[in-house]
Amino acid sequence: LLASSAASDVYKRQLEERTPKKVLVLDLDNTLWGGLAGETDHTPVLLSEDHSGLAYKNLQRVIKLMQEQGVLLAIASKNNEEDAMEILEHHPHMLLGPEDFAARRINWDPKPDNIRKMAEELNLGTDSFVFFDDSEAEREMVRQMLPEVTVPDFPARPEELAPCMAKIYEEYFARAVITKEDREKTAQYRANAGRNAMAEQAVSFEDYVKKLEICLIPVDP
């Protein structure tokens, strides 16, 4: 028991001394689910409670827990956005919905470019990002073009996905203390990104305030 307590204290000190990563960037096809979006309708992709789809659902369970511990989730997927969103919004076994992601880039642009844009949107450095993708070519491109981004290896078998993600959490994201603010980070960053987007579109300060639906009350001098 004493040895276990001492080991726990050492681990806690290690967590306190390091700077945890903040954003987990996820691919979709053959990563968050098995198969390819858009090939048929939204049900045949591998994501279920049976053997063929359970590995991907277990992965989503781990990622959902990470999000609840304050990890920001983002999507970088080469896909038709409509097909991908159909699965995210309507697949009966999806545990992660659009509202769980602080930023999304579902298009055909290079993934390093999309990661840069999401970093700007979230106002975070790319050195706080971890990129998880089944494609070796995509992983290598991010390593070459964004060497500050952490790019773990992808497991060889689907059943290794959930244990691999749990290890990624412990190695890069785990914190000594999780606060209420940490647990609400996704909503906070989504709101900030929305305000920033409105600010860019506004032609004047008054227009920006109007878009935010804020009432300004004059104060007498």
Feature names for model-found ranges:
Residues L54, N58-P92, R104-R105, V142, ...:
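Substrate-recognition element of Asp-dependent hydrolases with the DxDx(T/V) motif
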Residues T19, T43-L47, E68-Q69:
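Basic, amphipathic N-terminal segments
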Residues K22-L36:
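Asp-based phosphoryl-transfer active-site loop
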Residues L32-Q60:
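Active-site neighborhood of HAD-like aspartate-dependent phosphohydrolases
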Residues L1-A7, Y11:
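Single conserved hydrophobic/aromatic residue that forms the stacking wall/gate
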Residues L32-W33, A55-V62, L73-A84, K111-M118, ...:
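Extended, hydrophobic alpha-helical segments in both membrane/secreted and soluble proteins
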Residues E89-P221:
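C-terminal cap/substrate-recognition subdomain and adjoining C-terminal extension
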Residues G34-P44, K78-L95, D100:
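Metal-dependent catalytic core segments for phosphate chemistry
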